[in-house]
Amino acid sequence: MTEVETTHMNAGTESQQEPAELAEKQKAIGNAFYKEKKYAEAIKAYTEAIDLGSDSALAIYYSNRAATYMQIGEFELALCDAKQSDRIKPDVPKTQSRIRQAYEGLSILNEAEVYLKNKQAGLALNALDRLQRRIDSTTQPPMSWMYLKAQVYIFQNDMDRAQKIAHDVLRLNPKNVEALVLRGKVMYYSGENAKAITHFQEALKLDPDCTTAKTLFKQVRKLENTKNQGNDLFRQGNYQDAYEKYSEALQIDPDNKETVAKLYMNRATVLLRLKRPEEALSDSDNALAIDSSYLKGLKVRAKAHEALEKWEEAVRDVQSAIELDASDANLRQELRRLQLELKKSKRKDHYKILGVSKEATDIEIKKAYRKLALVYHPDKNAGNLEAEARFKEVGEAYTILSDPESRRRFDSGVDLEPGMEGGAGMDPFDILRAYQAGGSFPGGGFPGGGFPGGSYNSQGFGMGGGFPGFTSFQFS
């Protein structure tokens, strides 16, 4: 601990003796308070000594008050007093040391502010810890330090610690404007915008010229209004305009991680409605990068993965959601559904084989089959084993999807075990012959006993001029 000076200065003339003696008494009182670590009382006593003391004694009084300011972290006030002491009595080693220490403290404080401005939170906290070690451990640091540390915690999204600092200050002084602004900022960055607005309004009642409160009040209202406009547009089914509103809101305050996560999640939901699942996945990833335990974000990302048929990822997201909320029966039902889709994805996908969507009509399925059967038929691919395999695959897919009951069972996932899919072993040439026969094949054939369009060129492709036993086929 910095020691105060106790040297007694001799009084001058008799007219100066009485105030000088009073000044010395105040200095002694200040020294006693200093030793008891009652720094506020010590500062008051030294101030009275300065007001009463003679010029020859002022150097010690200023130096002692500087030492006291140092103990509570008021380095700027300490520097002013130490410099004043040095002007009155230059080159005193103890005074020079206090000037140096005050400059060092101010330099570290400036470091912390620069680090925070550059978003280097870890370095900012390190600087503040170094400052803390320079003052008496029993004293509360200056409000400016506490406010700065709370700012760092907000940047780190550690709202509990930031909230505690604001609470501690307001407990001591409920009308502290800086603390009200700080607590409002914590509320704001915790996503509690209504409470934040209340705190900023209270701060502005106490200090209408508080620039920080004014700026934050306007910002939170703008962000909240823009977000709500997006929500209203979404409820109205106006998804493109909702997307644009959420995008606008995301630009207002990128540092408000809590609200930004919600906005990303909202925009991801809109993107799913707009059939843009890749972008929805990116937005939900961004939301979860901010908060990995964001339940709604996990649900939305699971939907994005589902839309992209990334079943394993969708299952993992729902499992993570269940870990966060094990009581949600809907989540467990969703997990079972996605696990079934995952199993279905590991079997042969007849829709993909035919190149049609799962919503394809019977006519679309038949057209797709005809086109692929022409491409891979052995007449066109003599000796090509890969084409022969694809030809069989196409026939098998058509066998399943052209029959309503088989298709229903396939879609529902009933037939997941090998060998359970109806018609799986049917000869692909029999499928073609069904067209010629006029529709004995499950699900019916094309009108007129074959593909639309008339007769097949008898010159054919190698195997006797065309498909075996099939004469009414035309390539397109």
Swiss-Prot record:
Its main location: cytoplasm. TPR repeats lie at residues 23-56, 59-92, 143-176, 177-210, 223-256, 261-294, 295-328. One of its GO terms (cellular component) is cytosol. Residues 349-414 form the J domain. It is found in: Cytoplasm. GO terms for biological process: protein refolding. SUPFAM superfamilies: Chaperone J-domain, TPR-like. Keywords: Chaperone, Cytoplasm, Repeat, TPR repeat. InterPro entries: DnaJ_domain (IPR001623), J_dom_sf (IPR036869), TPR-like_helical_dom_sf (IPR011990), TPR_2 (IPR013105), TPR_rpt (IPR019734). Residues 1-22 are annotated as: Disordered. Gene3D superfamilies: DnaJ domain, Tetratricopeptide repeat domain. Residues 7-18 have a biased composition (Polar residues). It comes from the Eukaryota. This is DnaJ homolog subfamily C member 7 homolog. It comes from Schizosaccharomyces pombe (strain 972 / ATCC 24843) (Fission yeast).
